[in-house]
Amino acid sequence: MEFTPRLQQGILLRRYKRFLADVQLSDGSEITLHCPNTGSMRNCLYPGETVWFSTSDNPKRKYAHTWELMTTPDSGLIGIHSGQANTLAEEAINKGIIKELTGYDSLSREVKYGDENSRIDILLQGAQKPACYIEVKSCTLLEDGQGYFPDAVSLRGQKHLRELMHMVSQGHRAVLLFVVQHSDIFSVAPAAHIDPEYAKLLKKAVLAGVEVLAYRCEMSPTEIHLAQACVVRV
């Protein structure tokens, strides 16, 4: 996925009220960005470091600028826009990058499923194979060299694991796909120290037949895309 038009840069001052961040531009002026990330952003906030943001020409938006990337102190990059994970996953599936998810005839987004009033991120269907239900999660938390999910207690994430297990019990294929938007994460594990119930459910889901995949993103201020698989430690 290319960033069009090109991203602009500034220096992070602060994130506040969950969905807002103040940034200083090169001329010394300050602007407020929309922060499109519902998580805690634990270990992803570095005041004084460079951020990259997009700008919308939609006059109805209260905040025209959206925070896209964060530069880490060691010059790494973090994808802040967690909502892009689904788009990145769809793009990678369509291009055949995720080898485990090839060979289907159609791809649908946000389809109702399960018994807890949920919508699946991606549904793959093919004439010669079971339907494949894919839940996509953005992984950005790095601690002691290990990537973790979630970065806060996630009741919604727990619900999605139950739904995936339900789909397996109905004879379908179910996949949890971690989209790793941190250049220094090379393996993903459940954050049992943050959400022990999620970690327990994930182990249960794997035993029930839910597949878990993780793919790293290659990121730059001009584009971002899924590139290669990484290790999952359940």
Swiss-Prot record:
UniProt feature coiled coil, ranges: none
Stored Pfam families: SfsA, SfsA_N
Lineage: superkingdom: Bacteria
A single GO molecular function term of this UniProt record: DNA binding
Classification via PANTHER family: SUGAR FERMENTATION STIMULATION PROTEIN A
Matches recorded under NCBIfam families: sfsA
Protein name from the UniProt record: Sugar fermentation stimulation protein homolog
The species this protein was found in: Shewanella baltica (strain OS155 / ATCC BAA-1091)
Name of the gene this protein is made from: sfsA
